[in-house]
A protein has these predicted regions:
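Extracytoplasmic low-complexity segments
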Residues: 1-40
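Long, well-ordered core segments of solenoidal/helical folds
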Residues: 37-45, 58, 97-114, 148-168, ...
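Extended ligand-binding groove/face enriched in aromatic
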Residues: 37-155
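Carbohydrate-binding/catalytic loop surfaces
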Residues: 45-70, 119-138, 167-189, 220-243, ...
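Well-ordered alpha-helical segments within folded domains of soluble proteins
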Residues: 71-87, 126-141, 175-192, 240-258, ...
Length: 596
């Protein structure tokens, strides 16, 4: 089913003479046969899920109509990726022959078209969508070395998109999201093949147009498959936000960018999208017939995830199944010169680093555990261990080697490096305490989403309007908001607040959820002591309490009271707070009792 994006043909057998068959594991008697089609209507190598008329129609079409032409090159990518992966997995030359033949056919066709026709085709919504075909063609070119294959990859250049992205000009408003995200992964592969800087610049700048400017808290992007204006988050939330394919392709792009620039922001995003949207897109039950993955993940109040989309078979079912095979593929990276090992994700895994003759075994229940242990096995080797310090790990990140603390100051959103000659049995223990925090919608600071470390917490409630929640009432001197929540016994990462249970977004249930809530702090309260004073706000929505707690962590109660007094004085001077109310606020802060 190519339209579902099931680009996974590695288990098919190939036989040009009698045909290879693959037995249907479901027992329904369906088999698969795939062989090279030398008798294509226009050129050898034609292999598609459509007749050639679909490709011809696309070339003459000036407007999109996916009921007549539905993305023939998108489907070609799925087939090409599948047969290419079959070759990479099995080294069966017949699979490579299929892939090469497909690209020979595409080059013979597309190279004859005027540039204006190509630009018009690739700019058409849906009909001109081609997914990750450029990446796949570049992968093939790396094997065959055929100049025609590299030239073919460049025939998919969408000049308006490349030029604007390379210049860091944001033109994403109104574009179909998943039609364009994988294009930039292809541009990175073209940069690898050609060294042309504008491809790298375009991909890097594009990523920055999505993260954070069009990103929901779970790492997803798009609403109704399309992007809206930059920095509009609250204004785009709907039942059709966060198409699952978009998260899949943003992970691929982030991973590929990291190959070129080892910036921790790419892996911070990777962790966010993987541990929230991607894990949460799969229902937590088995099914022999259906993949049970989401198409959209609605972020409206009380939304119930649909794991069997009413739209029928979707692209997201295919990428959803692929995602389940890729949980491990960005945990570790080695430096190009072999001098360092990057630990990007904290996930139970084992790395066999053959060049160094060592293994690294990671033992953890992260994110249900706030630590992990790396154990070196095999021989001994000298290298730098670069441990990602997540951007959310703002306090308490600690590393020990064989029980001894490693000196240094870990900086959130960076790598903490431990260099030594490693020997079998060495143990590296990493502790990273989680803190409760909020992230605010860029266009409405009162609309917020809740995180505990890397984990997005969602309220389970059938209410169809946003929950109204306050979090400052029991905030501790550290600024951690966690004391405002009550843990649920026997259910890791579950808490209650104001009578509502909050659970990890990644749990694939059919509970109605609230990913966003309305922040409501109507009165100034410290340590559960109510001053009786209304919590005033500036024109941008920032409240008095927001400004006070922005100074956290506080070394002592006295430091907090000093912050309260100086903030109150500024607000009184600005006419936002009366002198009498200001005195009440300071007095309440002085009398309250605080958690650490």
């Amino acid at each position: 089913d190519a339209s579902a994006g099931r680009g996974d043909l590695a288990s098919y057998a190939f036989d040009e003479t009698s045909g290879g068959t693959f037995a249907d594991a479901s027992g329904r008697g369906l088999t698969a046969t795939l062989r090279r089609t030398w008798g294509g209507p226009s050129h050898p190598g034609f292999l598609a899920a459509y007749p050639e008329t679909q490709f011809i129609d696309l070339e003459s079409r000036t407007t999109s109509d996916y009921t007549k032409v539905w993305a023939p090159y998108y489907t070609a990518h799925k087939i090409l990726r599948g047969v290419l992966d079959a070759y990479l997995t099995t080294e069966d030359a017949r699979a490579l022959d299929l892939a090469s033949g497909m690209c020979d056919w595409m080059y013979a066709r597309l190279s004859k078209l005027p540039e204006a026709t190509l630009q018009r085709m690739w700019g058409l919504f849906s009909s001109g969508e081609f997914g990750g075909i450029v990446e796949a063609i570049c992968d093939l070119h790396a094997i065959t070395g055929k100049a025609e294959h590299l030239a073919l990859a460049r025939l998919f250049d969408l000049d308006r998109l490349i030029d604007n992205a390379a210049a860091n000009t944001d033109i994403l408003d109104g574009l179909h999201a998943n039609q364009h995200i994988p294009i930039f992964t292809g541009y990175l592969r073209l940069y690898d093949a050609t060294g042309e800087q504008h491809y790298l610049d375009a991909a890097r700048n594009f990523w920055g147009m999505v993260v954070p400017h069009r990103m929901y808290g779970i790492g997803g992007t798009s609403t109704g498959e399309f992007w809206k204006a930059r920095d509009v988050i609250a204004g785009t939330i709907s039942d059709t936000t966060a198409e699952t394919c978009c998260a899949y392709n943003m992970l691929k792009l982030s991973r590929t960018l990291f190959f070129h620039e080892q910036q921790p922001k790419y892996m911070d995003y990777y962790e966010r999208a993987l541990y929230n949207q991607v894990l949460g897109s799969k229902q937590d039950r088995a099914d022999a017939e259906k993949p049970l993955v989401t198409y959209f993940i609605g972020l409206t109040p009380g939304h119930v995830r649909d794991y069997t989309p009413k739209q029928g078979t979707t692209c997201c079912e295919g990428t959803g199944m692929e995602s389940a095979t890729k949980y491990q593929d960005s945990v570790y990276f080695k430096a190009a010169d072999g001098s360092a090992l990057y630990v990007n994700l904290y996930s139970p895994s084992q790395l066999n680093w053959t060049e160094k003759g060592v293994t690294v075994t990671q033992t953890t229940a992260f994110p249900r555990e706030q630590s992990t242990t790396l154990t070196v096995g095999g021989g001994s080797a000298a290298f730098a261990l670069r441990l990602r310090v997540p951007a959310w790990a703002t306090a308490g990140f600690r590393v020990t080697v064989n029980g001894r603390a490693v000196s240094g100051t870990p900086t959130p959103g960076s790598y903490f490096t431990v260099s030594r000659t490693w020997r079998s049995g060495d143990k590296v223990r990493i502790s990273m305490p989680f803190r409760l925090r909020v992230e605010k919608a860029l266009d409405d600071p009162s609309l917020q989403t809740l995180f505990y470390g890397p984990v997005n917490l969602v309220g389970r409630s059938s209410a169809t309007s946003h929950l109204q929640l306050g979090l400052y009432r029991n905030a501790g001197l550290s600024g951690d908001l966690l004391p405002s929540l009550t843990p649920v016994s026997g259910k890791p990462l579950h808490h209650t607040l104001a009578g509502t249970e909050f659970a990890p977004f990644f749990e694939g249930t059919e509970d109605p959820t609230h990913a966003y809530f309305k922040r409501s702090e109507p009165r100034v309260i410290f340590g559960n002591s109510d001053s009786g004073v209304a919590n005033p706000a500036k024109s941008d929505g920032t409240t008095l309490l927001d400004e006070i707690w922005a100074g956290a962590p506080f070394s002592s109660k006295g430091a907090l009271v000093t912050r309260v007094r100086s903030t109150v004085n500024a607000w009184v001077a600005a006419g936002r707070l009366s002198g009498a109310d200001g005195q009440k606020v300071v007095r309440t802060a002085e009398q309250a009792t605080y958690a650490p």
